[in-house]
UniProtKB/Swiss-Prot annotation:
Family: Belongs to the cytochrome P450 family.
InterPro entries for the chain: Cyt_P450, Cyt_P450_E_grp-I, Cyt_P450_sf, Cytochrome_P450_monoxygenase
Gene of this entry: eupD
Tree of life domain: Eukaryota
This protein's name: Cytochrome P450 monooxygenase eupD
Organism field: Phoma sp
Signal peptide: 1-19
Molecular function per GO: heme binding; iron ion binding; monooxygenase activity; oxidoreductase activity, acting on paired donors, with incorporation or reduction of molecular oxygen
């Protein structure tokens, strides 16, 4: 999927590449599989409707399909747009959480005092250990969210951000004027590491979020405004569950021969962040 990182900034390039035999083979196979999943979803919805088992939609794709069928003004404008939404949902709903949790594991091993602090907090919250774990109590430990925010600040799952188009009248930002109908991008990775917005910007410091809020800081891990990530709450819930259960159950360290250097320096921009393998050992506490 490395091609996705390139064509996101040059969307017209995909049409050219598709004319070259074999140039987009892997992407086309992925797109075909996503289309099959969309067809299966439509079939299951048709069965539900035929048997009067309609219920409130529980996933984003159901909302999108229903909006198209009902002619809602917020619906994807074309079938092609719906297929693109399917590819986005499948990619964003799987890779991003796995990438982020792997990055969290790396930072926790590289900063053992932070992991020890997390374990102390979890032990205090769950004195009987993992057997007494509940999500409602785990989500009440702010330090878990600090770790999530700081990991996504330094290694956002979608480093490049997304393209936007300026309004026809243009856009004035301080002393800079951007003409209308211009494609712009705010690079998430760069903003997150800018020392104007974060002290010791290159360092992993979860405690900085005791004073900062992801809603007001220069923090774009989930984008902002009406285009914010629709899976933000689900992803946050999954990461809270993984981090809290990890801290209660395991001691972690790099596997023999692993130092994390390649993992930290050889990531690639492929729309979502591509990360090398990270060899680790998990030992029960």
């Amino acid at each position: 999927m490395s091609i996705a990182g390139l064509v996101t900034t040059l969307p017209w390039l995909m049409n050219m590449l598709r004319a070259v035999p074999g140039a987009t083979g892997r992407f086309e196979r992925f797109a075909g599989w996503c289309y099959e999943q969309l067809l299966l979803k439509r079939e299951s919805l048709a069965v539900e409707r035929a048997t009067n088992h309609n219920h409130e939609p529980r996933d984003v794709m159901t909302w999108l399909i229903n909006s198209m069928d009902e002619g809602d003004r917020c619906a994807p404008p074309t079938e092609s747009a719906l297929q693109e939404d399917a590819r986005t949902l499948i990619s964003a709903g799987s890779d991003t959480v796995a990438i982020t949790f792997t990055n969290i594991l790396y930072f926790l091993v590289k900063h053992p005092t932070i992991y020890q602090k997390l374990q102390r907090l979890m032990d205090h919250e769950f004195p009987q250990g993992y057997s007494s774990w509940t999500y409602n109590k785990a989500k009440g430990v702010p330090y878990i969210d600090y770790i999530i925010h700081e990991t996504l600040r330094l290694r956002p799952a979608v480093p490049m951000g997304f393209l936007r188009q300026t309004p026809p009248q243009g856009l004035q930002i301080d002393e800079i004027f951007i003409p209308g109908d211009v494609i712009v991008n705010v690079p998430t990775y760069t903003i997150h590491r800018d020392s104007r917005y974060f002290y010791d910007a290159a360092k992993f410091i979860p405690e900085r979020w005791e004073e900062l809020s992801p809603d007001t800081a220069a923090y774009l891990a989930f984008q902002r405004g009406p285009f914010t990530c629709s899976g933000k709450n689900l992803a946050t819930m999954q990461l809270r569950m993984l981090i809290s259960c990890l801290a209660l159950r395991y001691r972690i360290h790099f596997a023999p021969g692993e130092d994390g250097v390649a993992f930290a320096t050889q990531e690639k921009e492929t729309l979502t962040m591509w990360i090398p393998p990270l060899q680790m050992v998990f030992r029960p506490r």
